[in-house]
Amino acid sequence: MTPQTRTPVVPEEELERLEACAADGIYSAGVNTVTNLYSAKIFRRWWKGSSVLEMGCGDGNTTRILLEDFDDVTVIDGSRALADKVAGEFPGVTVVCELFERWEPGRTYDTIVLNHTLEHVYDMVQILECAKQWLSPEGVICASVPNARSLHRQAAVLMGMLPAEDALTPSDIRAGHRRVSTPESFRAAFIQAGLRIEHSGGYWLKPLSNAQTDEWFTPEMNDAFMALGERYPDIAAETYVIATH
């Protein structure tokens, strides 16, 4: 049974919010696409089994990679526009358009992927509790979110452009983010949800804003700085967790 909703999420308002974020298209171009693909590259080291649930599909870039490794792919997203896009591009995928808080799959999955999803939800622990119930006994959860201690956020605070490292920027708000986690607060959510953390880390050493990166960085530079973040996870732009029961 799915845990009872303990948050003030109003379904109609939340669905409208998700559609507005999807219509903006902020994740469909530039370095945002690069970072989501790099997340999938990292997750690929740990995901397992033949079935996968992708919680939050974005524009389908991660879905495409999942189809290379899994026979049974299910995607759930609250945005009708994004769900229809993925269903149209990948006819072999089971696509569900619903809020996580209201869904009951009636089955479990070997791997569950939340690629830059948890920063959007109202209650991160509640959603992880749902994911735990939907995870097979030997399964794995792979999740990533932006890191509040990113080098570029620390620089923004020193320059007076951001009041605190975990403050929401205009880009965060535009993308529908509700929080910016530290590595510690992100890991704490998994522990509170009753999950076991097998590995955590970071990627993308990010000295500049997304707009500056899109303007000045070559693909080779993006690749290098994504990888450098794995060497310096505490100040990387993205933080991730690999968790099990």
Mark where each language-model region is.
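Conserved N-terminal segment of class I S-adenosyl-L-methionine
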Residues: M1-R107, T111-N115, L128, G202-L205, ...
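A generic structural signal for alpha->beta connector loops
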Residues: F70-D72, G92, E138, G194-I197
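N-terminal hydrophobic or amphipathic segments with adjacent small-residue motifs
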Residues: F43, S50-V52, K132, E138, ...
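S-adenosyl-L-methionine-dependent methyltransferase catalytic module, highlighting the catalytic core
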Residues: G25-V31, N61, Y122-Q133, V140-T244
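Short catalytic micro-motifs in class I SAM-dependent methyltransferases
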Residues: H116-H120
